[in-house]
């Protein structure tokens, strides 16, 4: 098969220490990449690259299954999931498996089944990966032209894009079917403190759903992260799945327009950079969602959000001091503002103290106490239920903040209490991974553009400064 790049471009990359270490079609001389450059050696070997991707999928699914079973084996039903460092079981619980009213786990068998199914799937993928990496054809173009490709073939590339979009659309509809047909999903807003329910009346209004995209990302607006009812979330997945599937069909049936052929770089490394950029965006959005959103990520499973823990603390002390005789409506704090209650910039009654910064929090345990103008004083005096007190005290002591002292007015625990919220883990990991993916996007985009423009040189090894330096030994 014709090599798409001049091999001279790659000779600056690295020199093998062991010149005898050669795999046909995968050594430095034929590919221009040394062994440590990984899949770059397979740029023009579609069969072997397929093996690498299938094996990688097998590793991912194996982790999911093994970690799932590990969490099931360590799970203690009497403790909340977020106290046990779990990150997979909360996702399964959110999908409505094994939980009942209030997010209580009533059956762990579905979690076990999930783990075993993923392990079995990973074995199939692992076998496929090994087969295509070692035994299958090196290139697919001759034997299986439908699965073969040339990176420069714009029409084939958009067809592959279309297939991917259809698969993403099907994935989106799987959530819709789970919520609508197969038992429903967990709704933290269900009356009485959350329950599993079928989502039958989902929102399909484009003005509501696309309105989220047009909202400001700041404050109480919160862009798409501000979604707070499952009808909107499932309706959004109906729209998203439909757009992905229709877009996929469009990309399969059409060829790229002239402006797209001119504007985009059409090479393997360019596609890698586009993909990394998309994944970086996904990572940053997921970070914000798991940190701020308590509807898609219910606090019963993931622990409270930062604002939620802070508001829960203010509520807990309001309840305590009100019982001790404080007049919470008029008590003044050290700054002259209300100690327990004050007014927001737009006039609503909100909690006073440092938690004022989180006044736009919405949480299922707090909303019943609001009236048309914010917190309702008469409800705070007469209508607080024991479950609201219990939940706020629990959330107050489980803030997703890794600190030894008070942060934002929230009392965090001493170091002996070994607690890190899954929200902290998931938000931090997705931000860091998203950032690295973004750097990778910039790196590969720069290389792809340079290669397309024909000026990528690399380091000239003949005049490298280290060659003129004294040997270390």
Swiss-Prot record:
Residues binding [CaMn4O5] cluster, per UniProt: 367
Gene3D superfamilies linked: photosystem ii from thermosynechococcus elongatus (1.10.10.670)
Membrane topology (UniProt): Multi-pass membrane protein
Cofactor annotation remark: Binds multiple chlorophylls and provides some of the ligands for the Ca-4Mn-5O cluster of the oxygen-evolving complex. It may also provide a ligand for a Cl- that is required for oxygen evolution. PSII binds additional chlorophylls, carotenoids and specific lipids.
TM region positions: 69-93, 134-155, 178-200, 255-275, 291-312, 447-471
Main location: plastid
Residues with Phosphothreonine modification: 15
Sorted UniProt keywords: Acetylation, Chlorophyll, Chloroplast, Chromophore, Manganese, Membrane, Metal-binding, Phosphoprotein, Photosynthesis, Photosystem II, Plastid, Thylakoid, Transmembrane, Transmembrane helix
GO molecular function, one term: chlorophyll binding
Propeptide: 1-14
Entry's localization field: Plastid, Chloroplast thylakoid membrane
CC terms in the record's Gene Ontology section: chloroplast thylakoid membrane; photosystem II
Residues making up the signal peptide according to the UniProt record: none
GO BP term, example: photosynthetic electron transport in photosystem II
Record-listed N-acetylthreonine modification sites: 15
Domain of life (superkingdom): Eukaryota
InterPro entries xref list: PS_antenna-like (IPR000932), PS_II_antenna-like_sf (IPR036001), PSII_PsbC (IPR005869), PSII_PsbC_sf (IPR044900)
NCBIfam families in the record: psbC (TIGR01153)
Family under the similarity heading: Belongs to the PsbB/PsbC family. PsbC subfamily.
Subunit structure and binding partners: PSII is composed of 1 copy each of membrane proteins PsbA, PsbB, PsbC, PsbD, PsbE, PsbF, PsbH, PsbI, PsbJ, PsbK, PsbL, PsbM, PsbT, PsbX, PsbY, PsbZ, Psb30/Ycf12, at least 3 peripheral proteins of the oxygen-evolving complex and a large number of cofactors. It forms dimeric complexes.
Stated role: One of the components of the core complex of photosystem II (PSII). It binds chlorophyll and helps catalyze the primary light-induced photochemical processes of PSII. PSII is a light-driven water:plastoquinone oxidoreductase, using light energy to abstract electrons from H(2)O, generating O(2) and a proton gradient subsequently used for ATP formation.
Full protein name: Photosystem II CP43 reaction center protein
Source species: Pisum sativum (Garden pea)
Protein's gene: psbC
């Amino acid at each position: 098969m014709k090599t798409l790049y001049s091999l001279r471009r790659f000779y600056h990359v690295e020199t093998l220490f062991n010149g005898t270490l050669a795999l046909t079609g995968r050594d430095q001389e034929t590919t221009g990449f040394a062994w440590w450059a990984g899949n770059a050696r397979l740029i023009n070997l579609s069969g072997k690259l397929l093996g690498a991707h299938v094996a990688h999928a097998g590793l991912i699914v194996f982790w999911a299954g093994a970690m799932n079973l590990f969490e099931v084996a360590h799970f203690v039903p009497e403790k909340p999931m977020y106290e046990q460092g779990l990150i997979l079981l909360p996702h399964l619980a959110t999908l409505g498996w094994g939980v009942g009213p209030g997010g209580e786990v009533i059956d762990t068998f579905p979690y076990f089944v999930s783990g075993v199914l993923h392990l079995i799937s990973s074995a199939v993928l692992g076998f496929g990966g090994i087969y295509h990496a070692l035994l299958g054809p090196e290139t697919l173009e001759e034997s299986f032209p439908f699965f073969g490709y040339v990176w420069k073939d714009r029409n084939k590339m958009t067809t592959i894009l279309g297939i991917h979009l259809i698969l993403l659309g099907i994935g989106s509809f799987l959530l819709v079917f789970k919520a609508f047909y197969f038992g429903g999903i967990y709704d933290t807003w269900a009356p009485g403190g959350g329950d599993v329910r079928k989502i039958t009346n989902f929102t399909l209004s484009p003005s509501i759903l696309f309105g989220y995209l047009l909202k400001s990302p700041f404050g109480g607006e919160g862009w798409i992260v501000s979604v707070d009812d499952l009808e909107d979330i499932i309706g959004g997945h109906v729209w998203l799945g439909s757009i992905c599937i229709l877009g996929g069909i469009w990309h399969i049936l059409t060829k790229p327009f002239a402006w797209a052929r001119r504007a985009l770089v059409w090479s393997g490394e360019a596609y890698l950079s586009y993909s990394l950029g998309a994944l970086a965006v996904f990572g940053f959005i997921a970070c914000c969602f798991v940190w701020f959103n308590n509807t898609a990520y219910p606090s019963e499973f993931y622990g409270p959000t930062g604002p939620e823990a802070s508001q829960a603390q203010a509520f807990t002390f309001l309840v305590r001091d009100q019982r001790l005789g404080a007049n919470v409506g008029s008590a003044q704090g050290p700054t002259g503002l209300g100690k327990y209650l004050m007014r927001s910039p737009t006039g609503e009654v909100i909690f006073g103290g440092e938690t004022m910064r989180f006044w736009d929090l919405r949480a299922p345990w707090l909303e019943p106490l609001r009236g048309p103008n914010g917190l309702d004083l008469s409800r705070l005096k007469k209508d607080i239920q024991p479950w609201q007190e219990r939940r706020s005290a629990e959330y107050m002591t489980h803030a997703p903040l890794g600190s030894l002292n008070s942060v934002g007015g929230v009392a965090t625990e001493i170091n002996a209490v070994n607690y890190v919220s899954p929200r902290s883990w998931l938000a931090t990991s997705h931000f860091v991974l998203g950032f690295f993916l973004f750097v990778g996007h910039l790196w590969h985009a720069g290389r792809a553009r340079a290669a397309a423009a024909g000026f990528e040189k690399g380091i000239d090894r003949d005049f490298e400064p280290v060659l003129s330096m004294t040997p270390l030994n």
